[in-house]
């Protein structure tokens, strides 16, 4: 039996996390929903969605840096000789856009379509008890995304439980990866999902037990954007072998206020900045 390889990657930098405290993301929309980015790192344009611009509050897009991260990671996969035959991703917009960036970086955006799998969505606890609303595959197709419109998912959005426990989330992830593997019996698979997915999609596949909540959160907090993990199989036995590409590291670049150059009371600005930084470290 030939070796099979599965690569699981976290999405790129998201707008709400990058700009949540500054307000620049939400304030880029006016009262009529017209969008004008207030920071160079905010996306220049946004896709139209049936639920209106308000839908971006719970289904955030990538930042410009997030999309660049995706393309650079795709290039790294290509440079390391990684071949991909099947692609699946979470229905979250940030995962959709990350998938597009990865395929572009690999030079596969004209050759491979990806399938949107709701079973790969993040733990429902993070949905904050509001059922998520995504852009449907048929609408993504109309917007130009290379989506397999006729794909039959393992899970539907209505099957995702709002009271999902951590054990339920592990089982959903494990069930999704098993269904994908049963349908794609040959070739290598790329899965683009969430930070926790690198753990929950592989843990039971390689014979591990569901982790404690504390251990789960530790791993989640130490899985940065575009992290990648590989599992491979010989004779039907799966093992985790690390990542086929190096880590993606860069520094945090804060918002610049040009008016500070003409402000006399820099002490008050310093206190305000330190307060914001302290809030950031506790989130």
From Swiss-Prot:
GO molecular function, one term: acid phosphatase activity
Active-site residues from the entry: 10, 11 (tele-phosphohistidine intermediate), 194
Record has Cytoplasm as a keyword: yes
InterPro entries: His_Pase_superF_clade-1, His_PPase_superfam, Phosphatase_SH3-domain
GO CC, one annotated term: cytosol
Recorded effect of pH on activity: Active at pH 4 and 7.4.
Subcellular location: Cytoplasm, Cytosol
Function comment: Phosphatase that dephosphorylates some steroids such as ecdysone 22-phosphate (E22P), 3-epi-ecdysone 22-phosphate (E22P) and 3-epi-ecdysone 2-phosphate (E2P) in vitro. Also displays acid phosphatase activity towards 4-nitrophenyl phosphate (pNNP) in vitro. Has no activity towards 3-epi-ecdysone 3-phosphate (E3P) in vitro.
Record PANTHER family: UBIQUITIN-ASSOCIATED AND SH3 DOMAIN-CONTAINING BA-RELATED (PTHR16469:SF27)
Name under which the protein is recorded: Steroid-phosphate phosphatase
Organism: Caenorhabditis elegans
Upper taxonomic lineage: Eukaryota, Metazoa, Ecdysozoa, Nematoda, Chromadorea
């Amino acid at each position: 039996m030939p070796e099979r390889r599965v690569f699981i990657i976290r999405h790129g930098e998201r707008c709400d996390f990058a700009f949540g405290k500054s307000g620049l993301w939400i304030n880029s929309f006016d009262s009529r929903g017209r969008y004008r980015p207030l920071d160079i790192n905010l996306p220049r344009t946004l896709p139209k969605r049936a639920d209106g611009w308000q839908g971006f509050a719970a289904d955030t897009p990538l930042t410009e840096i997030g999309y660049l991260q995706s393309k650079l990671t795709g290039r790294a996969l290509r440079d390391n000789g990684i071949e991909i035959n099947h692609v699946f991703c979470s229905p979250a917009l940030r995962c959709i856009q990350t998938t597009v960036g990865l395929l572009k970086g690999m030079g596969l955006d004209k050759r491979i379509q990806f399938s949107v799998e709701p079973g790969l969505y993040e733990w429902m606890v993070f949905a904050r008890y509001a059922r998520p609303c995504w852009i449907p595959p048929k609408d993504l197709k109309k917007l130009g995304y290379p989506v397999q419109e006729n794909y039959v998912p393992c899970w539907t959005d209505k099957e995702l439980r709002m009271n999902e426990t951590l054990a339920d989330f592990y089982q959903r992830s494990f069930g999704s990866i098993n269904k994908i593997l049963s349908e794609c019996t040959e070739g290598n698979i790329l899965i683009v999902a969430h930070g926790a997915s690198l753990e929950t999609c592989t843990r039971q596949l390689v014979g591990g037990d569901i982790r404690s909540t504390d251990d789960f959160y530790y791993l989640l907090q130490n899985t940065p954007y575009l992290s990648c993990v590989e599992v491979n199989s010989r004779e039907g036995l799966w093992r985790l072998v690390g990542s086929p590409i190096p880590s993606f590291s860069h520094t945090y670049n804060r918002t610049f206020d040009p008016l500070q150059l003409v402000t006399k009371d820099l002490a008050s600005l310093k206190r305000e900045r330190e307060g914001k930084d302290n809030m950031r470290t506790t989130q």
